[in-house]
Amino acid sequence: MAGTSSEAEAEALAAARERSRLFLSGLELVQQGAEARVFRGRFQGRAAVVKHRFPKSYRHPELEARLGRRRTVQEARALLRCRRAGIAAPVVFFVDYASNCLYMEEIEDSVTVRDYIQSTMETEKDPQCLLDLARRMGQVLAGMHDQDLIHGDLTTSNMLLRRPLAQLHIVLIDFGLSFVSGLPEDKGVDLYVLEKAFLSTHPHTETAFEAFLKSYGASSKKSSPVLKKLDEVRLRGRKRSMVG
């Protein structure tokens, strides 16, 4: 009986994965990464983005299945955690555990904060014009960290702006590396990752990032130890650079 049950479960899983494969084949592939593919299309009549964590041939199948499922669940929970706290993030439509697919709301007609900053700097050529955006970023990320949610990959490409852009309505995306932690060290590292990405992607914007940190400090109930840890992480980073 046990063998028959296992065979039936395996057949059901294979059938579910085949249905998912056929559905994805009808969508538009918009991004191919090392860990996942991102598709755009319609899901139950709604504009959707589907993130598919595809299996890696170099990993043991059982380990791969557990890792893919865990990361898919973590990302879905992170999005829900944000939304419950009033932080804008895509709506989760459906989680396909058989194929490790996450079906989410597409933020239509949005632009990345990265593209917005680059366009604004090309037009205005003055980082002062970014201060309001930087302050808004500080408020949003302070709220996220106050929920003990660590993004894990903070860049300006992982933040979207809804239109009208002047309202600075930021939507956080791509929580694939997220996790829950109340440790100031983890939050400090999160900010350090953003700082490195921000200043390397957007040269001559140091004043804007300073405005971001001031806003973060004023908006977060737990900012003091986090910003102290950020300074420590910076120092460690400089020491590693000097050592080579």
Swiss-Prot record:
MF terms from GO for this chain are: ATP binding; hydrolase activity; protein serine kinase activity; protein serine/threonine kinase activity
Q: Which reaction does it catalyse?
A: L-seryl-[protein] + ATP = O-phospho-L-seryl-[protein] + ADP + H(+); L-threonyl-[protein] + ATP = O-phospho-L-threonyl-[protein] + ADP + H(+)
Cross-referenced InterPro entries = Bud32, Kinase-like_dom_sf, Prot_kinase_dom, Tyr_kinase_AS
**Active site, per annotation:** D153
Pfam families assigned: Kdo
PROSITE patterns recorded: PROTEIN_KINASE_DOM (PS50011), PROTEIN_KINASE_TYR (PS00109)
Domain Protein kinase, first and last residues per copy: 24-244
- The principal location of this protein is nucleus
Motif annotated as Nuclear localization signal, chain positions? 69-86
Q: Out of the domains of life, which is the source?
A: Eukaryota
Task: Please list the GO biological process terms of this entry.
Answer: tRNA processing
> Can you name a GO cellular component term?
nucleus
- Phosphoserine PTM positions: S25
Q: Where is this protein found?
A: Nucleus
Ordered alphabetically, the record's keywords are: ATP-binding, Hydrolase, Kinase, Nucleotide-binding, Nucleus, Phosphoprotein, Serine/threonine-protein kinase, Transferase, tRNA processing
| E.C. code | 3.6.-.-, 2.7.11.1
Which residues bind ATP per the record?
A: V30, Q31, Q32, G33, A34, E35, A36, R37, V38, K51
Protein family membership: Belongs to the protein kinase superfamily. BUD32 family.
Which PANTHER family does this chain map to? EKC_KEOPS COMPLEX SUBUNIT TP53RK, NON-SPECIFIC SERINE/THREONINE PROTEIN KINASE
Record text on subunit structure and interactions: Component of the EKC/KEOPS complex composed of at least GON7, TP53RK, TPRKB, OSGEP and LAGE3; the whole complex dimerizes.
Q: What is known of its domains?
A: This protein is considered an atypical serine/threonine kinase, because it lacks the conventional structural elements necessary for the substrate recognition as well as a lysine residue that in all other serine/threonine kinases participates in the catalytic event. TP53RK has protein kinase activity in vitro, but in the context of the EKC/KEOPS complex, the catalytic subunit OSGEP switches the activity of TP53RK from kinase into ATPase.
What the protein does comes down to: Component of the EKC/KEOPS complex that is required for the formation of a threonylcarbamoyl group on adenosine at position 37 (t(6)A37) in tRNAs that read codons beginning with adenine. The complex is probably involved in the transfer of the threonylcarbamoyl moiety of threonylcarbamoyl-AMP (TC-AMP) to the N6 group of A37. TP53RK has ATPase activity in the context of the EKC/KEOPS complex and likely plays a supporting role to the catalytic subunit OSGEP. Atypical protein kinase that phosphorylates 'Ser-15' of p53/TP53 protein and may therefore participate in its activation.
**Protein name (Swiss-Prot/TrEMBL):** EKC/KEOPS complex subunit Tp53rkb
Species of origin:
Mus musculus
Gene designation per UniProt:
Tp53rkb
